[in-house]
Amino acid sequence: MNTESAASTADRLRAAVHWLLPTRLLSRLTWHVARSPRPWLKNRLNRFLVRRYGLDLSEAEHSDPTAYPTFYALFTRALRPGARPLPEDPQALISPCDGTVSAVGHLHGERLIQAKGIEYSLRGLLHGLDPAPFRDGAFVTIYLSPRDYHRFHAPVAGRLQAERHVPGRLLTVAPSAVRAIRGLFLRNERHVTLWETVVGLVAVVPVGAVNVGSIETVWGGPVGEAPGLSRDFGPGEGVFLGRGEELGRFNLGSTVVVVLPAGVVRWADGLVAGRPVRMGEVLGRLRRADAR
């Protein structure tokens, strides 16, 4: 099991301050400002974003930050075609997003590791969906900072079997908060998706954060517009996504958790907490569920 280091006193102090912030109000204000098309506002914000966080737009659809119609459009920018060629190995599990690995390893029964010394419940994360297929399975958690590309993609080809929108807090998911706030991913808004794949069910769970009040999926749009959304799909009914196809997007920094069944993935050498990853990068190698 590989996780970030334990919480420091500074981490706990930052978390305590963050608890006092009106995060949902801040997210609503950010939502309106980020979608303003006024050139004087959005161009200043977009240039500030590039300077403040060092955004690399060389792979983006537009390399000029003022070419984006809104601040939100820059944050949720698309990559230009061909910017991220996928690995030729059909058994490669790819990173669903750009970001930094905050935890990777295997479940202890139905328990995942959030950070050093902090576990949380898979049953709680899935919010009513059956955790049994993932018992003693594998997981990886990837944090997206404000500078990262903010769309997330299918780590393996699959058909959507179920989805659940879970309303919740919008606490920061920055590394300091992950180390300090127990059950952080269970407290925050998230959208649980289960995918039927060649290795069995795979869960992909985008987790919201402060300023990230609107998780979107490519098949349903902003999921926050249907709080408590709960849908199950019969054979052949759910959307099918090929490996690397866009699954959704969200604004500002957030987190994606991927959970797999036991025995179906061998993590790549060097995949450890703190390592930067890019969408399309190989995280591990899969083997079919029936080959175990």
Swiss-Prot record:
Q: Which cofactor does it need?
A: pyruvate
Gene (name only): psd
Catalysis performed (reactions):
a 1,2-diacyl-sn-glycero-3-phospho-L-serine + H(+) = a 1,2-diacyl-sn-glycero-3-phosphoethanolamine + CO2
PTM comment: Is synthesized initially as an inactive proenzyme. Formation of the active enzyme involves a self-maturation process in which the active site pyruvoyl group is generated from an internal serine residue via an autocatalytic post-translational modification. Two non-identical subunits are generated from the proenzyme in this reaction, and the pyruvate is formed at the N-terminus of the alpha chain, which is derived from the carboxyl end of the proenzyme.
**Residues carrying the site annotation Cleavage (non-hydrolytic):** 253-254
Q: In the record, which positions carry Pyruvic acid (Ser)?
A: 254
Q: What is this protein called?
A: Phosphatidylserine decarboxylase proenzyme
Return the broad EC class: lyase
